[in-house]
Every structure is written in structure tokens, then in C-alpha cells.
């Protein structure tokens, strides 16, 4: 079963929970495959309880319909800060944001792009990379994710000291 067919199977059950199916990633493996289902609730975000409820519903559907051959692990999660972008609507929603896009077929000899999402239509997304527009057909996108600005979110690690810089003086404690 394709990811699109899985989405069609799961979307109504997830919508009944008041949640949105963001997308599905299936990673086949010779041992146990991984089926990752991303859910969201745009107004308030996702809680662990939402993931648990969705996981129970999805598991029940998968047990009845058995769309995945072999053994697999089901993982239900929020999209997170490095949110995957699966559809043209996702790119539209995050226009102006930074995205990292991997393509199936090289464009000008490259398979990886990162830039600001400038424009989106039914056929392609345009990003600005290094000051130049790059048009990428939706059908050529292998994987796309947002690139969060961790510094703006206050989540960036402290900048390391310059090489050769002196360490701050330590104060000695003791009895004088």
C-alpha cells in the first residue's frame, strides 16, 4: 500500500479525533519496518494524550485492514520544529520560512537545497537560495523539512569561545 493510500485510510479516523494528518513516512527494513505518522492540531499543538489516542485508533485500523506487509513499528508524533512538508498546502502555509529540500533528480547537478520558501503553485515550489530563485517540481521532492531559527526561538546553544581565548578566572574558595 502506498503512503497516499495509507493516508486515505487513516485520515478519517484522525479527523474524527479533531486532529489533522500531516503525513506518513514508511521506512522499510529487512527486520522491522517503521511506519511514522505525523499528526497536528494547528490551534493548540499536539499533546502526548493526542498521540496516544491517535495511536490506538491507527493500530485498530491497521489490524483490521492489514495494509503493511511484514513486521513494523508504529510511531505517532507531532511534526516538531523541523516539520516535514508533504503537500503543496504545507509549503503555502509556511511561505517565508526556511526549508531544506532533497530531490529525486538533480537540478543543476544538486540534490539538496536550502532556502526561504518564496512561491508555491500546483506544480512547483520556488525557494530563494543564495539570493537566486530555485524552482522545484513537487513530483521531484524526495523529502522536505522546515529549518527552524533556533536562535530566534531562544533555543540556540551558547556560542563557543574563540580558539586561544583565555578562560574566565576561577575564584578560589577556602578559609583565609
Residue ranges of predicted features:
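Short Lys/Arg-rich amphipathic alpha-helical segments
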Residues: 1-176
Amino acid at each position: 500500500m502506498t503512503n497516499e493510500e495509507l493516508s486515505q485510510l487513516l485520515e478519517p479516523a484522525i479527523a474524527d479525533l479533531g486532529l489533522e494528518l500531516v503525513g506518513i513516512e514508511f521506512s522499510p527494513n529487512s527486520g522491522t519496518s517503521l511506519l511514522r505518522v505525523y499528526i497536528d492540531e494547528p490551534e493548540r499543538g499536539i499533546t502526548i494524550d493526542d498521540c496516544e489516542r491517535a495511536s490506538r485508533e491507527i493500530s485498530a485500523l491497521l489490524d483490521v485492514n492489514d495494509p503493511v506487509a511484514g513486521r513494523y513499528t508504529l510511531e505517532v508524533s507531532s511534526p516538531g520544529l523541523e516539520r516535514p512538508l508533504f503537500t503543496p498546502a504545507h509549503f503555502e502555509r509556511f511561505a517565508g520560512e526556511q526549508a531544506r529540500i532533497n530531490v529525486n533528480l538533480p537540478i543543476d547537478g544538486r540534490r539538496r537545497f536550502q532556502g526561504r520558501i518564496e512561491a508555491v503553485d500546483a506544480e512547483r515550489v520556488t525557494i530563494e537560495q543564495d539570493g537566486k530563485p530555485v524552482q522545484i517540481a513537487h513530483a521531484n521532492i524526495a523529502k522536505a523539512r522546515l529549518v527552524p531559527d533556533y536562535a530566534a526561538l531562544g533555543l540556540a546553544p551558547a556560542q563557543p569561545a574563540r580558539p586561544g581565548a583565555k578562560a574566565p578566572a576561577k575564584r578560589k574558595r577556602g578559609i583565609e
